Amino acid sequence: LQWDFLSDFFRVPPPFFLTGGTALSAFYLQHRYSEDLDLFTLDSEAFNRTPMYLADAAAKIGASAVSLQTAPQFRRYKIERRGESVIVDFVREVVPQIEEEKNIFEGIVVDTVTEIISNKICAVVSRAEIKDYIDLYCLNRAGYPLENYLDFAQRKDAGVSPAMVAYLFSEIKLAKVPDFVIVSITVAELEEFFQTLAQKLAVRSFPS
């Protein structure tokens, strides 16, 4: 259902791009399951047309769509078809983009790794969900060192600092690796990685 919806939504592409965990997993890392879709736009008029775009794409794939939440810059829908469902979040992005040019995979407009990792660092500061830590660990393992993206994250959110991120990383405690992870990771590996990174960031924050 996810793939059918995205394929039709971007058939005549509106000015939106896929970002977040699904974009990261489906198009870059293949590291975990992600059930929802995050579609962002920088265009206010396009955001206002969200109900039309959604209804058209859902109808063409034989799905129904129900509005779950509406806010000035956020809309959440549930798409259903034959027992399957997916949550789709539409966001009017107001934060400046580090890389305005996005990637295109099989016709689907996808956010860049630089944008996604910067947003993930911001997310750790604002909400600290385990999926964000998993994503950051797997990004680092794939060759994207987190410390290289802190400055980008700070451009998006002034509340991000090496000291704050170091503290949050040092506090991570896991009972188990979540079931949505599909690559081989152990709790020990995760905790060791974030403890080591926390120490590096602490030194960066308070050099002797």
Located regions from the model:
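Compositionally biased terminal segments of proteins
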Residues: 1-208
